[in-house]
Amino acid sequence: MDTNNKDDSIIRFSVSLQQNLLDELDNRIIKNGYSSRSELVRDLIREKLVEDNWIEDSPDDKSKVAVLVVIYDHHQRELNQRMIDIQHASETHVLCTTHIHMDSHNCLETIILKGSSAEVQRLQLEIGGLRGVKFAKLTKASSFESNE
């Protein structure tokens, strides 16, 4: 396989699966509205590439980007200030935050982060461990070549 060929032509190849895996694949296609098995397989490969990109990170690579979604009780005393203090103290760059009031008790905040994978994940764990935080999920991202 020539990995240096970066054109955007589509290569057809075959995959052998047990029937139960094929059934599961087809169920996901229907459930998620994919137009074909190929579309689902491409998404699964991209997802794995992002995951591997985060695992293979070197401490000097500060280019990882992620979105941290936090739901918290805004009545929890000083929680908002502690979240801000953690963000300011972190080596991770906070690129943007968005804050919404979900209801009379809960706020949702999205925080777009850039930094090393270790530092970004550390920030997520720190914020997620605060009293009053009900949910903290990190969605990792990665850039792709234009033809991926």
Curated annotation (Swiss-Prot):
Domain of life: Bacteria
GO MF terms, alphabetically ordered: DNA binding; DNA-binding transcription factor activity; nickel cation binding
Record note on cofactor: Binds 1 nickel ion per subunit.
SUPFAM superfamilies linked to this entry: ACT-like (SSF55021), Ribbon-helix-helix (SSF47598)
Necessary cofactors: Ni(2+)
One example of a Gene Ontology biological process annotation: response to nickel cation
A Pfam family hit: NikR_C
UniProt keyword list: DNA-binding, Metal-binding, Nickel, Transcription, Transcription regulation
Biological role stated in the UniProt entry: Transcriptional regulator.
PANTHER family xref list: NICKEL-RESPONSIVE REGULATOR (PTHR34719:SF2)
Stated name of the protein: Putative nickel-responsive regulator
Organism encoding this protein: Helicobacter acinonychis (strain Sheeba)
Lineage: Bacteria, Pseudomonadati, Campylobacterota, Epsilonproteobacteria, Campylobacterales
